[in-house]
């Protein structure tokens, strides 16, 4: 043993606790001095010695017909600092009262020492009966390892679990694969979530265990080395699995050393500490990102090889007696029982461009897969390539052909990524494989996100997508050639991690790619523009005032034409949806639809003049009047006009006819001082909070504090002040998950806002610390946009999205006598990226001195 415990001849829980702590300290101090396998072996030896000594001291070794058997991870000798001690006490017959007491004493002692114990007491008959009924018990028994006691009795157990009538090889295989399918579903079928589980995520240690279990049930192979010697895996597969296993072991061991309670999740705060223990260096996030890149690449290799070998077992062992049906596809490919196979194992080495045809055939035959033998030949061929596939003219032609095939992304590009073909084709791809960004916004690695953007684009094709993405569906389904959009998606983030502006660098890369692949000048320019501008629509819709004609004109000028607007709309929506499933909601849909429609109108009108919103104002008035006449026949035109004359024209531009009619129906006969109403019926994409009252100090502060305290997300705030000093305030909110607010929650918020607005006190902030935010720093940044505007000032704020941020900002506005006219609230992971339209106390744009003062106060107070 590397670590020799100094346990006395008479064990006590306190002495064992001290030795456990000494062992942990030894491991921390020597983590980089020994191989991870030596550390795990050493810990297992420590447990073996402890349990055997305890077994003897309690007197169980003196009993006949009773044995101590390690099972589970302990049986495999995979013991990490916080692993459970799983063991079986095997008895020949039901224990006597005396033996039961000794067993209880044995287990209680281990609990008193602080161990997490998983134990069972069974006879051989019980092992057989319960093992047949429960695949988990059966698996534990397969991994059983003798510690002490009656060895012949253990040998009988070993023979029992190998019998075909215990679990047949096929039944055992199917049950374990079904467990894997269910586990993958829990993790959304991806290893690339940014807070992964080392054990259970796809590609994690459980995938290795599945491989062990299948081999163990089939041939009795207990280790990876034994599986290699059996010929079931190739030497290069063994080498990759061994390296990946060693890295995951190191990460898990380090994680357990820094935790107090058992957990295998690499949460953000833990990633920092684990990367330090593993020796990754770099200021700030790079060290974590380097470690996680290695981690995700290990997951990918394990997932690829273990699933390939499981498929190989199914096809070559379990299905070996199946009738063979062969369909010849061409000189090099054939279908054997609905699996794509090579007719000659050297095809890919001799004609590497044919690798692309393998995936072309996947798009042509919806229900076929690639045979495991062909996949293994593919892996061998990729390792032997002397050049990138894109350097081969025939491969370039085949690569471009894939984009316009049915289900090209799902059936060709996703598998090409999975099997390493994209890395073999694109020089830049390897740099983003497994590349995470240490933030809360991007929940997938860059390569996984990229494929999800492409897959989302493909999902715009079916008619069923029209409800959620009406504009993107209409555009994408009408494109005769979708190649440019798919290529733009493939390259939009390809330059991340290099430093510099990834959009600019990516634009250069995609232009080089397009030129190499023979695209014409117009296509090259369009691709470069799409990649360079892929964030422009998102920024404009979410962080600019899209009701400002100058904003629309500037955006239209950047688009240049309808085709580019259409392309960028599809790419932007797909990018948002593929970044984080919670980002896209009905409010976002309405924002992007409005910007798209305004830009279309600008193109239609011509680019010489700004959009004339007076026509929109007049039309909204007219439509609102029609709604009121139809739905509220008791309201007179005179009373409507009396109310509307109090409102600035801006009110009729920024609200829909339905909203205007709703507000009017509430206010024409209203004589009270305060009105708070919340509805889902009249606002596009969110729940509208409408507030009418006399303007008062801290109004915005009170509203946002109350909404935040009730756990809602604020997306938009619109402050309209009438000529006589009343406010028509509208806030668009949703639940935190993006859903509309249900009736009971709306009534609750109405009451809370009414109380807050009637009180002279500011509401107390309910601040619940966010675990994830504690480990991020965001530099507070203030930017003033379009400083030449005279009527108002536009300000953009970037800061850590901590609780109470909006209330804090509004308090600053109040202290500096600033009026808030409009706000857009955007959360980007741990960052708040908020947009405000302000005037000073005289209703004018802020002077330079006022802007400098505001900037100084925000930077000072918001950290």
Curated annotation (Swiss-Prot):
Its cofactor is Mg(2+). Residues 688-764, 794-863 form the ACT domain. One of its GO terms (molecular function) is [protein-PII] uridylyltransferase activity. CDD domains: ACT_ACR-UUR-like_2 (cd04899), ACT_UUR-like_1 (cd04900), HDc (cd00077), NT_GlnE_GlnD_like (cd05401). Keywords: Hydrolase, Magnesium, Multifunctional enzyme, Nucleotidyltransferase, Repeat, Transferase. Residues 329-687 are annotated as: Uridylyl-removing. It comes from the Bacteria. The keyword Transferase applies. SUPFAM superfamilies: ACT-like (SSF55021), HD-domain/PDEase-like (SSF109604), Nucleotidyltransferase (SSF81301), Nucleotidyltransferase substrate binding subunit/domain (SSF81593). It catalyses: [protein-PII]-L-tyrosine + UTP = [protein-PII]-uridylyl-L-tyrosine + diphosphate; [protein-PII]-uridylyl-L-tyrosine + H2O = [protein-PII]-L-tyrosine + UMP + H(+). Residues 1-328 are annotated as: Uridylyltransferase. Pfam families: ACT, GlnD_UR_UTase, HD. InterPro entries: ACT-like_dom_sf (IPR045865), ACT_dom (IPR002912), HD/PDEase_dom (IPR003607), HD_domain (IPR006674), NT_sf (IPR043519), PII_UdlTrfase/GS_AdlTrfase (IPR013546), UTase/UR (IPR010043). Residues 446-568 form the HD domain. Belongs to the GlnD family. Has four distinct domains: an N-terminal nucleotidyltransferase (NT) domain responsible for UTase activity, a central HD domain that encodes UR activity, and two C-terminal ACT domains that seem to have a role in glutamine sensing. NCBIfam families: PRK01759.1, UTase_glnD. Modifies, by uridylylation and deuridylylation, the PII regulatory proteins (GlnB and homologs), in response to the nitrogen status of the cell that GlnD senses through the glutamine level. Under low glutamine levels, catalyzes the conversion of the PII proteins and UTP to PII-UMP and PPi, while under higher glutamine levels, GlnD hydrolyzes PII-UMP to PII and UMP (deuridylylation). Thus, controls uridylylation state and activity of the PII proteins, and plays an important role in the regulation of nitrogen assimilation and metabolism. This is Bifunctional uridylyltransferase/uridylyl-removing enzyme.
